[in-house]
C-alpha cells in the first residue's frame, strides 16, 4: 500500500476515517445522478434489519447468492449483515424490491485484512430472489481494458466532507486505471476514478462496479467491488476495487455447492 498502515487503510475502506480540514462540497457516488427506479436491480443493499439503513453494497450473482467485500462481513460499526435488500431503489424501508435473510457468509480463502487482497465474500440467502443476477466476468480478465468506462452503484455519501447517505440508488461513471494507479495494488485489485468529485464514498463499500456491455441491464458485467481508497473525490486519486475476475474460481466453487 502506498502510505497507510493497516488500521488507517481499514478506516478509509470503511468510510470512517477522519475527514480532512477542507470544506468543499463535492458530488460523489455519482458526480452523475439517480438510477432510474427499476434499473440495476441486481444491486444489493446489506442491512442489519429488514427495513433499516443499508451500510454496504453488493451484487446478486445467483438467485441465492450475493457477492460483496469481506470488509462488509465485519460489523462496520453497524452490526453483521443480516438482510439483503435486492432490487430496491431506496436506502431503507420496504417500498419496493425484496428483503431476504442472509443465512451464511464466506470470505475468500486468501483474504488479507491488512492490505485487502482478495476482498471478496459470498453471502447465501434463505430463499431465491425473483430478480435476475448480474453477469460475472471472464476469468482471463478480458472484460477490463485501460481507460474503459465503468459504472459504480451505491447509496453512499453524496458529498464530502460532512456528507449524508443517498436515499435513492446512485451511480457514477468512472474510468478504469490499469497502470499508474495512485496505490500499489495486487492482482486481485483494479483502480477506477481520479476525476475530481466522482468517486465511491462512505457507505459504498462492496458496491458493484460494472461494465455496460449492451443496451440493457441484462448485458451488464460485474468487474469490481468498491474496496478502499483515500477520502472521497480527490483529483487524480483513483479508488481501489476488488477485481472480480481474480476471485472467479473461488466464487464459482462457493455458489455451485
From Swiss-Prot:
Location(s), subcellular: Secreted
Main localization, broad class: secreted
Disulfide bonds: 56-72, 181-191, 201-232
Signal peptide: 1-28
GO cellular component: extracellular region
InterPro entries documented for this protein: Peptidase_S1, Peptidase_S1_PA, Peptidase_S1_PA_chymotrypsin, Peptidase_S1A, Trypsin_dom
GO BP terms: proteolysis
Induction per the UniProt record: Expressed during pathogen infection.
Keywords assigned: Disulfide bond, Glycoprotein, Secreted, Signal, Virulence
Residues bearing attached sugar chains per UniProt: 107, 180, 213
Known role: Secreted effector that suppresses host plant glucan elicitor-mediated defense responses. Targets host endoglucanase EGaseA and inhibits the EGaseA-mediated release of elicitor-active glucan oligosaccharides from P.sojae cell walls.
Family listed: Belongs to the peptidase S1 family.
Description of how the protein assembles with itself and partners: Interacts with host endoglucanases EGaseA.
Protein name stated in the entry: Glucanase inhibitor protein 1
Organism: Phytophthora sojae (Soybean stem and root rot agent)
